[in-house]
């Protein structure tokens, strides 16, 4: 009788052990199948990165998130590695444990060289610029281009272009030209522009009025203080 109980107990333990091993195997398979395939992830547009910047996984992931705000959290600067070639960047899982949650690869396009002669503006068709001493600040000019609907990638900065205002009959036109030797931008384009209106609180007459009021207030305060001291004496 006792032997039968021992045998039943042993059989039960063996069954439990087999069940545990089976569950463990299933768990491993589920985990293995739960890997995220990079190729299934979307990227709306080309990444606004230079080839040099695209060699940095952190910058690639950051730009990818700009194009795909719901990018899976498994994709991080540490979980992927990148390789750049032919104006494209290939994203693959990082080596070792860092990339074990990922599989496959994803090829992302880079914006490449911005060809200025291909830029177009929105419905306004004109830029709004602030001209000082016949010149336009490049940083402000790039901002005006983007506000007017021109698709200028983030790879183009104020050191890459110049804005030159025309003369005589072309005084209402500005030439945007790539600086020689730059790899992010090329060519040139001419746009019509209107001069930005100065806000009333920045006009000369308003600033002069404020200065006069401040001086008058200070002078009045000094006069009152001196007069009061004389009375006290």
Swiss-Prot record:
InterPro entries: Phyto-Amp. This is Antigenic membrane protein. The keyword Signal applies. The chain crosses the membrane at residues 206-226. Keywords: Cell membrane, Membrane, Signal, Transmembrane, Transmembrane helix. GO terms for cellular component: plasma membrane. It is found in: Cell membrane. The keyword Transmembrane applies. Its main location: membrane. It comes from Onion yellows phytoplasma (strain OY-M). It is a single-pass membrane protein. Residues 1-32 form the signal peptide.
